[in-house]
């Protein structure tokens, strides 16, 4: 029995087969168990001798079962490890990856250009008050300049708009029509000198076509300090042109009216590659009435006036126009169309 059992144990192919062999020989109804139950019928001397033989067989079977179980477990583990082994030299699985939107790419490029010139990038709320969007920028109620912007007016029910220092702002609410309100907000909360740019989304209630959208992006610039002059503004726009279009680019200013600057100008940049002038935006020296409105607001908050005797310049330009030029996009509506084939072209562009 021993030799037969040891051979069967050694040839067991898996743990289930080994478990069956253990039950066959050592279980409650196993062969060895039955042999031991029959010891009581034997004479004393023969019982003692036979008992020793059966105990030796039991010990040998238990040792063989334990050794075979350990060997089978190690083999199973080795097989599992081999099956789950990862070849790190193989190429990785191809995963879908997104990319930055062309507007984001253009906006980041503009911000980095001005950061290199010492400007700080700040952001403001898209839901704005009539005061910051119009009144403080020298565009009072019934001023004809308000006709330049068709505005999305809001009811404001249940909405609390905060001012530059966390105070509640009263009055009619709207979706900002330009990024210029952040000029006033920043000046209320800070004192000169400073240089900032304000990238952001703006809203106009107008008909859309290939060059006009109801939602688009602007980049606002504001520099305030003692002795700031029009020459500094020209220098800033010149540096922008050089960074965007190379050393052969030039800048042209033409007088134009904006209520919040005086004098005001429309600036264009010479595009050497295209061989033409590109109108990029408007600019000018900050109107004294804007500084007065800022100081008046500061005084209402208990702050001392900070904008007497200083000057500053401001400028604004459209991000979509530059992105259309940079990436050869013929229609502004492509930016918000949500077409994956269009957006996937910009994957990997930094």
Curated annotation (Swiss-Prot):
Reaction equation(s) it catalyzes: tRNA(Phe) + L-phenylalanine + ATP = L-phenylalanyl-tRNA(Phe) + AMP + diphosphate + H(+)
Record keywords, A-Z: Aminoacyl-tRNA synthetase, ATP-binding, Cytoplasm, Ligase, Magnesium, Metal-binding, Nucleotide-binding, Protein biosynthesis
Residues that coordinate or bind Mg(2+): 262
Top EC class of this enzyme: ligase
Entry-linked Pfam families: Phe_tRNA-synt_N, tRNA-synt_2d
Essential cofactor(s): Mg(2+)
Cofactor descriptive note: Binds 2 magnesium ions per tetramer.
GO BP terms in the entry: phenylalanyl-tRNA aminoacylation
Keyword Manganese applies: no
EC numbers on record: 6.1.1.20
Gene3D superfamilies xref list: Bira Bifunctional Protein, Domain 2
Subcellular location: Cytoplasm
Gene Ontology MF terms in the entry: ATP binding; magnesium ion binding; phenylalanine-tRNA ligase activity; tRNA binding
GO cellular component: cytoplasm
UniProt subunit comment: Tetramer of two alpha and two beta subunits.
Family affiliation: Belongs to the class-II aminoacyl-tRNA synthetase family. Phe-tRNA synthetase alpha subunit type 1 subfamily.
Annotated protein name in UniProt: Phenylalanine--tRNA ligase alpha subunit
Gene responsible for this protein: pheS
